[in-house]
Amino acid sequence: MAAESLPFTLETVSSWELEAWYEDLQEVLSSDEIGGTYISSPGNEEEESKTFTTLDPASLAWLTEEPGPTEVTRTSQSPRSPDSSQSSMAQEEEEEEQGRTRKRKQSGQCPARPGKQRMKEKEQENERKVAQLAEENERLKQEIERLTREVETTRRALIDRMVSLHQA
């Protein structure tokens, strides 16, 4: 198994990024507590016939590598008793997940691919920093050239003055 790079750097992480990671973790953990979760892997046809509930697409997004929308299908529904309290609890959980998704959409993050979105934002931020540092570098070069010219003129003036004092 090949080692994968971390989806983040070891630098300081912004609070909104930490909050998004925390929400993603909560979604994954809560889906694990609900029932046996099943993520189909290639060449696993015999296990696909088992009864599992599937994860919310937002919680699966960080697991997928290929671009495009995440497709999650329900292979079969877990049996529910006619007890209304269980069905109302399931509805409440679904509403909570939808609320979290809406909250994330409102904060400007894409729930379908939060890891890739963060990486893209980080890359854009790094490009802005590079451009900003290049501008600062150019400004500093010009300042160095200006100061070098100023030192040269001051040095010449000082030499001329010393020469004129010795001649007098």
UniProtKB/Swiss-Prot annotation:
PROSITE patterns per the UniProt record, alphabetical: BZIP (PS50217)
Region Basic motif: start-end pairs: 100-129
Stretches for region Disordered: 34-139
Low complexity bias locations: 73-88
GO CC, alphabetical: CHOP-ATF3 complex; CHOP-ATF4 complex; CHOP-C/EBP complex; cytoplasm; late endosome; nucleoplasm; nucleus; protein-DNA complex
Domain of life from the UniProt record: Eukaryota
Subcellular location: Cytoplasm; Nucleus
Annotated spans, Interaction with TRIB3: 10-18
Region annotation (Leucine-zipper) ranges: 133-147
Post-translational modification: Ubiquitinated, leading to its degradation by the proteasome. Phosphorylation at serine residues by MAPK14 enhances its transcriptional activation activity while phosphorylation at serine residues by CK2 inhibits its transcriptional activation activity.
Record keyword Nucleotide-binding present: no
Domain bZIP intervals: 98-161
Residue segments, region N-terminal: 10-26
Keywords for this protein: Activator, Apoptosis, Cell cycle, Cytoplasm, DNA-binding, Growth arrest, Nucleus, Phosphoprotein, Repressor, Stress response, Transcription, Transcription regulation, Ubl conjugation, Unfolded protein response, Wnt signaling pathway
Effect seen on changing S14A: Loss of phosphorylation
GO MF annotation: an example: DNA-binding transcription factor activity
Assembly and oligomerization: Heterodimer. Interacts with TCF7L2/TCF4, EP300/P300, HDAC5 and HDAC6. Interacts with TRIB3 which blocks its association with EP300/P300. Interacts with FOXO3, and CEBPB. Interacts with ATF4. Interacts with HDAC1.
Family, as annotated: Belongs to the bZIP family.
Function: Multifunctional transcription factor in endoplasmic reticulum (ER) stress response. Plays an essential role in the response to a wide variety of cell stresses and induces cell cycle arrest and apoptosis in response to ER stress. Plays a dual role both as an inhibitor of CCAAT/enhancer-binding protein (C/EBP) function and as an activator of other genes. Acts as a dominant-negative regulator of C/EBP-induced transcription: dimerizes with members of the C/EBP family, impairs their association with C/EBP binding sites in the promoter regions, and inhibits the expression of C/EBP regulated genes.
Name of the featured protein: DNA damage-inducible transcript 3 protein
Species of provenance: Mus musculus
